[in-house]
């Protein structure tokens, strides 16, 4: 998707390309920020003629880790199957894969998430902090899982998108 957008946008205008994903999609967008230098498509005959690095990454209540202590079991099974190796577990545990040039991250989760353990986000935050990656981490006490961009669900998480918009402005991604 990043390649398609970058190769087909109006080059006379400045474009900012961010990626946002929720739950398992949060894992996917974090991978896009971490693995953008890897040309996984070349073996399929698809050649890259642009940067695959997103300008920013927004994982919301994300799956982060494939490690036994944190893994969302269904996500791990869907991604790795049932006969996975330790190397695969480590490769797809994003808290272990953050590069020094990771794009800025806006990370959101709630402690009462009944689907994805919030400690996934805590571990990602620790790694981003350790590597001095520009990021914001919103950790809410309540909000559950699946609140998306909704302001209708109420509670603390209802206004995360307003904080996100402010972050976009402060980081010069939008005016």
Walk through the language-model features, giving the residues of each.
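Primarily recognizes the serine-hydrolase "nucleophile elbow" in alpha/beta-hydrolase
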Residues: 1-71, 89
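C-terminal catalytic histidine-bearing segment of alpha/beta-hydrolase fold enzymes
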Residues: 108, 118-175
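Short beta-strand/loop motif that positions the catalytic acidic residue
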Residues: 101, 106-109, 113
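Mobile cap/lid helix-loop segments that gate and shape the active-site cleft of serine hydrolases
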Residues: 62-97, 103
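Stable alpha-helical elements in mature extracytoplasmic
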Residues: 1, 24-28, 94, 120, ...
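Hydrophobic anchor at the start of a short beta-strand
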Residues: 17, 105, 135
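A general structural signal for stabilizing positions within well-ordered secondary structure
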Residues: 48, 96-97, 129
